[in-house]
Amino acid sequence: MTNSNKLSGKNILITAGAQGIGEAITKHFIDSGANVAIHYFSSADTANELVKYATDKGLKTIAISGDLTKEEDANALVKITVEALGGLNILINNAGSLVARKMLSEMETEFWHKVMDINLTSMMFVTRAAAPYLAKNENSSIVNLASLAGRKGGHPGSLVYATSKGAILTYTRALASELGPQGTRVNAVAPGLILGTSFHNTHTTKESAAETTKGIPIQRAGNADDVARAVLYLASEYDGFITGATLDINGGVYNM
């Protein structure tokens, strides 16, 4: 039996599902026969391409824009998703950003709150809105996107990003305990160096990536598909007794 058998016909919401790791996750769900709601903030063209990709396979799909740091946008996202797909089985909390590198000495209070809102508060907004719908389905699940930076602190200038991603590790465990009785599993993935994404294209130099790759035991950086496959595993019913866990996807390196 394959993952596609477990995911076929399931209704999935992926935040930031039209770029980088999120785009790969969306494609893998579509290829597994799942119906998808694709949230995006600015990647409208890619979102529409993904909608066509899913529609051509006979799947239900919708692309929804929104600023998830706004409570009303998060609530609307979930409402529109449920109306379009007919329910919700799986939530993928992928939205997040480093925004910029800033050391503590140059950290403005406004910037701190901005990154925390993008990475953490928005996740709470969407999850809070989605939880009652997830409760209506057996074996529902949530997968949160954390980061190796949340375990190790990240590179210089990652203070608020790493802090927010570290909070997601605890958020995942706490939520697993809270939502377990309703039948919803909650897990996370913590990617390491994942190249070919806008995140690292923007915030990681080629020299830094090459130096980091030297320290990875399997001698290569990760890619978006590496993360997507792990997300689909945790989202599926195959891990029915795994909840509150964080799966590290970093090639065996823990000192980035």
Where are these regions (language model features)?
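A glycine/serine/threonine-rich, flexible loop-to-helix segment
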Residues: 48, 181, 191-216
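Short, small/polar-rich loop/turn modules that mediate ligand/substrate recognition or access, typified
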Residues: 139, 180, 185, 242-244, ...
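Substrate-binding pocket helix/loop in short-chain dehydrogenase/reductase
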Residues: 102-104, 111-114, 200, 208, ...
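Catalytic Tyr-X3-Lys loop
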Residues: 105-124, 143, 168, 218
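Active-site helix of classical SDR
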Residues: 127, 164, 172
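Residue(s) in the substrate-gating loop at a strand-loop-helix junction
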Residues: 147
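Alpha-helical segment proximal to the catalytic Tyr-Lys
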Residues: 132, 177-178, 240
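Short C-terminal tail/terminal secondary-structure segment
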Residues: 2-4, 98-101, 232, 243-256
